[in-house]
């Protein structure tokens, strides 16, 4: 058997810091189970001897107590330890995500990350107690086989042959089932991706019956494939269990009917050997029945290990965070900057650049251009969220690289097109509630929400109101460079005018640099410069 097939699960469980007591307790539990068999057989031999029978009864009671105590310790301790390991995995994935490069994280995908954080960890958690029972059953089989060999070497030989044949048959079934589980896992991720479209685009789905039917049909097709794969996987495990049961019954038949014909001396121990084999059947059946859980847990562990490897590859190199951020906005320089999106084969599908641009301190710069022209990608390059494929970006003469990335980004506050609004002011130190209330009043949403116990009372607001809160949070960060992507698009005409004619001049007067993507040509006068982007390049300059 190729042990490497089980390495993902073992790799995860190897992080356990359990002391050796659980191993000894596991062995003692299995040994006590085998001792019960020997005690029962010995008591049966001495049934006519009252004194010996009483001693056997006391010994039997002691062994039962030992078995129960050790079994309880092993089960409770192992379950607690597995949950500790899974907790460490969740925290490790969270930290890896937080340190990941944005573009590489986008390529990994939400469904993959959510699947590992929830589905895969739940699978391993549910299998934990079952796998502990399997380990114990394996030890019980070993100790019981030793006792069986002491009774009859012929019976032991037949038992070993049956076990080897059964394991080989089961191994092939497990490999087949594992492939089906992998297929089911990928299909399930595909279903979650499609269902995300249903949830996030629910308004559009409700407005278009044809779209709803088409998307529902797509979900139904994926769900049908998922059902078929899981049925085949479950059927494979069911047949595996059936073959295991069959092999046990054939073995019993061989020992009871065949072995006495081949070895006359066996007839004296046939009853004890048969009882021993029947005693082994339980643990052996447990082993066979836990293989589906073992296989599922291994596939889940493999998915987690692969995700962690992908996230580690996507992790940004260590950055020097000790350098303090500049209090005034330094000049931004971009020289020969280029960034490309690529397809699965690595061929560029869209390129932004080359860009040569200088943004002086406290400048108000508007970026205009059609949809898909590259404005949002440019802003992610500008803020250091996307590393350039070519060229150099510098801030105050300090080049953006792996060592300076955190320092560079610490100068930017942003409300991008795909912004996320948090319910708390994460990362904003020493929150001044009065300042928060002043900003909410300035943005005319003080009657809609507020800050209580460090969190907003509600975020169930219109798109424009949510953007106002997002901008208020960006201002609370008090960073020298403010980047906005179509911020005014969801604002009413009156507040849009306030934004361009009052707020932007006020922020500029405070010494902030403002870079904003916009389509509002009637307010271009609020900018010091207006650059036009087309097909990823700045093709026109308006002043």
Predicted features by range, described:
Residues 10-17, 102, 119-127, 179-180, ...:
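An intracellular "coupling" helix at the cytosolic face of ABC transporter transmembrane type-1 domains
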Residues 14-70, 149-157, 267:
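Transmembrane helix-loop-helix hairpins at lipid-water interfaces of multipass membrane proteins
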Residues 31-42, 133-174, 231-277:
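A hydrophobic transmembrane-helix motif
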Residues 36-40, 63-106, 110, 129, ...:
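Juxtamembrane helix-loop junctions of ABC transporter transmembrane domains
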Residues 98-143:
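Juxtamembrane loop-to-helix connectors within ABC transporter transmembrane domains
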Residues 207, 273, 280-312, 316-317:
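Cytosolic ends of transmembrane helices, especially the final helix of ABC transmembrane type-1 domains
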Residues 383:
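Helix-to-loop junction immediately C-terminal to a conserved catalytic motif
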Residues 415-456, 478:
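Conserved "ABC signature" C-loop
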């Amino acid at each position: 058997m190729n042990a490497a097939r089980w390495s993902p699960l073992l790799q995860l469980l190897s992080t356990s810091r359990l002391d050796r007591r659980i191993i000894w307790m596991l062995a003692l539990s299995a040994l006590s189970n085998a001792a019960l068999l020997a005690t029962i057989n010995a008591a049966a031999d001495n049934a006519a001897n009252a004194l010996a029978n009483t001693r056997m009864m006391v010994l039997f009671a002691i062994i039962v107590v030992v078995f129960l105590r050790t079994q309880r310790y092993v089960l409770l301790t192992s379950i607690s330890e597995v949950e500790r390991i899974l907790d460490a995995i969740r925290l490790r994935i969270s930290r890896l995500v937080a340190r990941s490069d944005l573009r590489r994280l986008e390529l990994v995908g939400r469904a993959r990350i959510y699947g590992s954080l929830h589905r895969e960890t739940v699978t391993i958690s549910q299998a934990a107690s079952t796998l502990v029972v399997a380990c114990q059953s394996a030890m019980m089989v070993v100790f019981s086989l030793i006792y069986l060999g002491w009774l009859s070497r012929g019976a032991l030989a037949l038992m070993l042959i049956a076990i080897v044949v059964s394991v080989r048959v089961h191994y092939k079934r497990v490999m087949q089932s594992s492939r089906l589980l992998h297929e089911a896992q990928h299909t399930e991720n595909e279903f979650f991706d499609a269902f995300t479209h249903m949830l996030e685009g629910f308004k559009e789905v409700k407005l278009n019956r044809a779209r709803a039917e088409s998307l529902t049909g797509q979900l139904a097709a994926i769900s049908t494939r998922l059902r078929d794969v899981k049925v085949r996987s479950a059927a494979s495990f069911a047949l595996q269990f059936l073959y295991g049961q069959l092999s046990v019954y054939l073995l019993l038949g061989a020992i009871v009917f065949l072995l006495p014909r081949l070895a006359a001396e066996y007839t004296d121990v046939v009853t004890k050997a048969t009882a021993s084999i029947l005693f082994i059947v339980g643990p052996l059946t447990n082993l066979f029945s836990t293989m589906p859980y073992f296989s599922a847990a291994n596939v889940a562990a493999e998915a987690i290990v692969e995700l962690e490897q992908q996230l580690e590859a996507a992790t940004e190199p260590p950055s020097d965070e000790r350098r303090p951020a500049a209090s005034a906005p330094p000049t931004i320089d971009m020289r020969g900057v280029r960034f490309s999106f690529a397809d699965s084969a690595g061929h560029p599908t869209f390129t932004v650049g080359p860009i040569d641009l200088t943004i002086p301190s406290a400048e108000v710069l508007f970026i205009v251009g059609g949809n898909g022209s590259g404005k949002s990608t440019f802003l992610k390059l500008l803020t250091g969220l996307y590393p350039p494929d070519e060229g150099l970006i510098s801030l105050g003469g300090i080049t953006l690289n792996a060592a300076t990335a955190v320092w560079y980004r610490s100068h930017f506050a942003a409300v991008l097109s795909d912004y996320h609004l948090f319910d708390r002011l994460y990362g904003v130190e020493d929150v001044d509630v009065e300042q928060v209330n002043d900003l909410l009043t300035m943005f005319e949403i003080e009657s809609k929400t507020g800050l209580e116990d460090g969190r907003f009372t509600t975020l169930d607001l219109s798109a424009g109101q949510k953007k106002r809160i997002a901008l208020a949070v960006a201002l609370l960060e008090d960073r020298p460079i403010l980047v906005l992507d179509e911020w005014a698009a969801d604002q009413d005409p009156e507040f849009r005018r306030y934004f361009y004619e009052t707020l932007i001049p006020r922020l500029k007067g405070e010494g902030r640099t403002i870079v904003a993507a916009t389509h509002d040509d009637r307010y271009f006068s609020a900018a010091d410069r207006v650059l036009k982007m087309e097909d990823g390049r700045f093709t026109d300059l308006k002043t």
